[in-house]
């Protein structure tokens, strides 16, 4: 059964938007209706009705699309998959994860019933539908790879040239090109994914250590900041490539100066899923002594409401805090999504550590002010990357070409009032263009992390419509090889009428 939510429904004002409250940009830009599908079998008929009535369909699983690709849909309809949320392990051992499953619910179900996990994100409310097909990653990805690396089949509803919606299951032998496209090209391109199947999944770690360390902005000189970035990037470019470090994932949150502290969060386990030997973690943390680390004040940014050291074993408290947890408790501890606000995001993959010029430009923008604009929720988050992700054989059978990077960057800024939109967008835009300016990037590609010796482009699950200003934007997200041309062929075959489209969807 499909539940139809129209503008007259009391639920409409809540369901018309997702996580990013910038969208819909106005009430007139909002979708005319929301179709809440209760079962996977409801999706094709719901989609058929939308097509037959001349409406444009957009798709929502968890509602975390950063841009206006879903909620901005005037006179269109959102197909909402959030009720398709019950993972199952079948008799043959395969795991089926419906598209509406949110990260935390999926982790709970897989762990409690089967001691399994998926190397997905730490944001608890992100839905599997968009997360997985965009190449979703998380704190276990250096150890276990990307979510799409484990994928064995996809249930998807496509629309043929005659406008007929029909479900199909695709895998390495049935519609293999569409299957590959669903392994990283991102959502809203080829059809409506209703579920993912995994022939097997990794066991969850038995325990992990969570380390937090902070650096006071008040004591952060340009030189100390540059040294912090040099040490962090150098580690992942060198020592971080060794397999005994792959169980370690770090998030360096380079906050705006007005936030008070820079914070580094690190999760660690040995490759066997235990914390019996913490020498790798201790060596990593010790490298930052010259940067004047201090204990964290308050709750770490990005930690969920369950953050409480009392449930774990405190191993160290100064200058950094290290707590040993069972894996599920640790996952709950870091599973923050943050409040629903207005936001803007940008991304970059880095194949090498930071240069002095990059560090100087980052410092400049994190310490400058914009009159009348609160930047205390603005930051550049630098995630460790690589490890099991960088298995080059995955380039040929997934749609994720970035398999040589050692860090993954997400530029973020959050605010609450539409009146502040322009100030925040200008700040983050200037920041990004400056970091990737010449001479670090060749003139034709200046302002972007174009694939080359230092960078590997951008992440499609962090879409940024500003990149559309560059004619080479597909190469930023899909590499400068033949992947985008391949995706265009898949698009023409499986969505010949371009039913599924948005500003950054694959062009026919």
From Swiss-Prot:
Its EC number is 1.1.3.29. Pfam families: BBE (PF08031), FAD_binding_4 (PF01565). Optimum pH is 7.5. Transmembrane segments: none annotated. It catalyses: N-acetyl-D-glucosamine + O2 + H2O = N-acetyl-D-glucosaminate + H2O2 + H(+); N-acetyl-D-galactosamine + O2 + H2O = N-acetyl-D-galactosaminate + H2O2 + H(+); N-acetyl-D-glucosamine + O2 = N-acetyl-D-glucosamino-1,5-lactone + H2O2; N-acetyl-D-galactosamine + O2 = N-acetyl-D-galactosamino-1,5-lactone + H2O2. Keywords: FAD, Flavoprotein, Oxidoreductase, Thioether bond. Binds 1 FAD per subunit in a bicovalent manner. The keyword Disulfide bond does not apply. One of its GO terms (molecular function) is FAD binding. There is a cross-link at residues 64-123 (6-(S-cysteinyl)-8alpha-(pros-histidyl)-FAD (His-Cys)). Residues 26-203 form the FAD-binding PCMH-type domain. The keyword Flavoprotein applies. It comes from the Bacteria. SUPFAM superfamilies: FAD-binding/transporter-associated domain-like. Its cofactor is FAD. Catalyzes the oxidation of a range of monosaccharides in vitro, displaying the highest activity with N-acetylglucosamine (GlcNAc) and N-acetylgalactosamine (GalNAc), with a reduction of O2 to H2O2. Acts upon the C1 carbon of the GlcNAc or GalNAc molecule, producing the corresponding lactone, which can spontaneously hydrolyze. Its biological function is unclear, but its main function might be connected to extracellular production of hydrogen peroxide to compete with other organisms through oxidative stress, or support the action of peroxidases and peroxygenases. Belongs to the oxygen-dependent FAD-linked oxidoreductase family. This is N-acetyl-D-hexosamine oxidase. It comes from Ralstonia solanacearum (strain UW551).
């Amino acid at each position: 059964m499909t539940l139809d939510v129209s503008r007259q429904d009391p639920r409409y004002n809540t369901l018309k938007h997702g996580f990013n409250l910038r969208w819909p940009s106005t009430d007139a830009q909002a979708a005319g209706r929301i179709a809440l599908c209760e079962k996977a079998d409801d999706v094709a008929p719901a989609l058929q009705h939308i097509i037959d009535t001349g409406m444009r369909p957009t798709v929502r699983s968890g509602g975390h699309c950063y841009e206006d690709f879903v909620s901005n849909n005037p006179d269109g309809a959102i197909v909402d998959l959030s009720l398709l949320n019950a993972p199952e392990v079948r008799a043959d051992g395969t795991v089926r994860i419906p598209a509406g499953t949110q990260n935390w619910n999926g982790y709970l179900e897989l762990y409690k019933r089967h001691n399994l996990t998926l190397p997905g994100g730490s944001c608890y409310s992100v839905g599997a539908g968009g997360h997985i097909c965009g190449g979703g990653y998380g704190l276990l990805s250096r150890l276990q790879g990307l979510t799409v690396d484990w994928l064995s089949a996809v249930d998807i509803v496509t629309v043929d040239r005659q406008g007929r919606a029909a479900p199909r299951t695709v895998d390495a032998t049935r519609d293999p090109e569409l299957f590959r496209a669903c392994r990283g090209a991102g959502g809203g391109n080829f059809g409506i994914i209703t579920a993912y199947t995994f022939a097997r999944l990794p066991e969850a770690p038995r325990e992990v250590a969570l380390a937090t360390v902070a650096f006071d902005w008040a004591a952060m000189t340009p030189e100390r900041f540059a040294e912090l970035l040099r040490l962090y990037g150098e580690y992942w470019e060198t020592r971080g490539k060794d397999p005994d470090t792959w169980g370690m994932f770090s998030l360096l949150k380079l906050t705006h100066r007005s936030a008070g502290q820079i914070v580094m969060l690190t999760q660690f386990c040995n490759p066997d899923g235990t914390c019996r030997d913490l020498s790798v973690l201790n060596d990593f943390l010790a490298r930052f002594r010259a940067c004047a680390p201090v204990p964290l004040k308050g709750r770490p940014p990005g930690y969920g409401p369950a953050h409480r050291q009392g449930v774990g074993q405190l191993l160290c408290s100064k200058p950094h805090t290290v707590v040993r947890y069972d894996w599920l408790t640790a996952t709950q501890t870091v599973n923050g999504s943050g409040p629903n606000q207005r936001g803007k995001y940008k991304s970059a993959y880095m194949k090498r550590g930071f240069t002095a010029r990059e560090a100087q430009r980052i410092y400049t923008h994190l310490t400058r002010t914009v009159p009348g604009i609160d930047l205390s929720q603005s930051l550049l988050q630098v995630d460790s990357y690589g490890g099991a992700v960088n298995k080059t054989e995955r380039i040929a059978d997934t749609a994720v070409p970035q398999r040589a990077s050692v860090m993954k960057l997400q530029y973020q800024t959050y605010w609450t009032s539409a009146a502040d939109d322009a100030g925040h967008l200008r700040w983050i835009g200037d920041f990004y263009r400056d970091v990737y300016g010449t001479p670090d990037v060749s003139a034709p590609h200046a302002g972007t992390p174009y694939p080359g010796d230092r960078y590997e482009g951008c992440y499609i699950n962090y879409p940024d419509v500003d990149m559309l200003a560059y004619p080479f934007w597909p190469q930023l997200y899909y590499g400068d090889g033949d992947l985008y041309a391949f995706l265009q062929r898949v698009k023409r075959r499986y969505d010949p009428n371009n039913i599924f489209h948005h500003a950054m969807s694959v062009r026919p």
